[in-house]
From Swiss-Prot:
Annotated compartments: Nucleus; Chromosome
Family matches, as Pfam families: ORC3_ins, ORC3_N, ORC_WH_C
Keyword line: Chromosome, DNA replication, DNA-binding, Nucleus, Phosphoprotein, Ubl conjugation
Record protein name field: Origin recognition complex subunit 3
Amino acid sequence: MATSSVSKGCFVFKPNFKKRKISVPIEDYFNKGKNASEDSKLRFETYQLIWQQMKSETERLQEELNKNLFDSLVEFLQTSHSGLWKNSKDWSCEIKLREIPTAALVLGVNVTDHDLTLRSLTEVLQNNVTPYVVSLQAKDCPDMKHFLQKLVSQLMDCKVDVQSKEKESVQVIQKNVHYSMDSLSAWYMSVTQKTDPKMPRKKRTSSSQWQSPPVVLILKDMESFTTKVLQDFIIISSQHLHEFPLILIFGIATSPVVIHRLLPHAVSSLLCIELFQSLSCKEHLTTVLDKLLLTTQFPFKLSEKVLQILTNIFLYHDFSIQNFIKGLQLSLLEHFYSQPLSVLCCNLPEAKRRIRFLSANQCENIRRLPSFRRYVEKQSSEKQVALLTSDKFLKEETQSLLENLHVYHKNYFLVLRCLHQFTSSLPKYPLGRQIRELYCMCLEKSIWDSEEYASVLQLLRLLAKDELMAMLQNCFKLFQSSSGKELGNTAKRIEEFLAQFQSLDETKEEEDTSQSQSKGLQKTDLYHLQKSLLEMKELRSTSKRQTKFEVLREQVVSFVDSLVREYLLPPDTQPLHETLYFSSAHTLRQHLNAAPRIALHTALNNPYYYLKNEALRSEEGCIPNVAPDICIAYKLHLECSRLINLVDWSEAFATVVTAAEKMDANSVTSGERNEIIHARFIRAVSELELLGFIKPTKQKTDHVARLTWGGC
């Protein structure tokens, strides 16, 4: 490239062609590394199938949980808009007309879930109320100019089902638009008045329900908006409400009190506010766990420690359902990647079919499972030899064990729900108020060995008859829905208890009537009264016999205790539970509970750990000469004391970099090369300062102070 010219000029050089980076498909990771096996592709396909089923189930749950909230909002918007235009014809309602219909939507502190909820709300409003739905964020609206600009730009993009000619006439070039409420009102009137009344019904959208559909403005994070911007917009909009029918929806994360904190009375009086409350985050989490984990619909399960990590992140960090589901997806992916026998984590008929085609290596993997080894130790010597030597016999036994595991889960979740019916309303909630708390305790150990369970049994022995019958009724409905033989007998046993409680009422009434008749025949003189009192006192002091109700209540408690001890065994006691349960809590904690200090030191000290480039592999204590500049500067600064001489640091950096670059001495002059290396060094030092490893010092101008810890 020649840059010689007679006159001064600017020379443009096209950059060298760079190959486009090829993204590696995720399924390729299953075929590499130490966990690769002959069925890696099948494991990945199974993972995708289960995750798609879980994802569709969570989306369906989200729609069901938000349905009541969205229906109430749609009804409010329709009522507000119809009342608005009805009053607009009556000029005596001018004051009422200036009140903007406002929905205060309290979404909770789980801010990361707000986007998904408001996105779904936008779709519902566009399908049922109006096509003009706009969502604004505080970061995009620092002042009134940008607020109106974003509002106008999104309104221009809203699609109205009108004829193509009308579309062309309505379109306005945004560069020529003067952003004001007058121009916005004029644009709105021009759009709404050009709808063709003779348009076929099939071509009409929800906007044709009214002559002028409202404009719904959603403020996603109201707490973050500037107070002056909100006040000015509300005051201006109230003056143009008869021309521009606006409805506001405030997305609130904290409390409705924030409206009165941000807006003075003169401004808040211009709003007709109605409060709407979304579902609690904890209730949402309980529903997700109930539909995804506490069911036999999905074979994948979590161990106690893994579930505890996910719930702790949810409860003590962000209250985000979306992040919880992402953690569940990560657990599912890690299970299918790290466990070769996860190929059996599918529905029971498919798992039995796959067992027949297991290879010799997979059979050996089954024999290595700790739970299977414990199972083999309990068998007879002949069966032990067959399980350890015959693959055919092993496959038959594996099919039987997986079927038993499926039956175990079916009974486990039914009895778990039954126990929750008895414990969820007890004082102080010894086993937790939510079923997820009870589930974690049952996963951890044999729950009947805990002190909390003993206190539950004591409290159950103090329940009144009405409370006990209500709990039995709920359990009867649960067991009646089961098709299992043993649990079917359990339902009959509960039905017998209910019948016995019912018979107690009848016998008690008969006894009361007979006693009242006998008392009527007895003499009521002082002698007989004293005699009867002495007899009652002696009877109470000599023996305290249990009533029929107390005996029956004790039988019910013993029955529940026997169910718990029989069916709520911990999952790790079941053979082959490793195929379905993900228990690598340490791996999940590394991915989700990031330790920035450790991760940063590892990345700078050993870049091969993350980049996986063989050229970066080096012995401990050595500096790879092809490492990134910041890594070289970081490892050099580790060798220095509290104060680092920039000149010495720069020379050491240049020495390492020069050894790495095998450049032709004639291609670039020595001075230019030194300038390039010096610039790279300055950039590396600036990056280290930005990360907080060093800082300038006033003690010596050519030195920097080291801020890092110890010798790392």
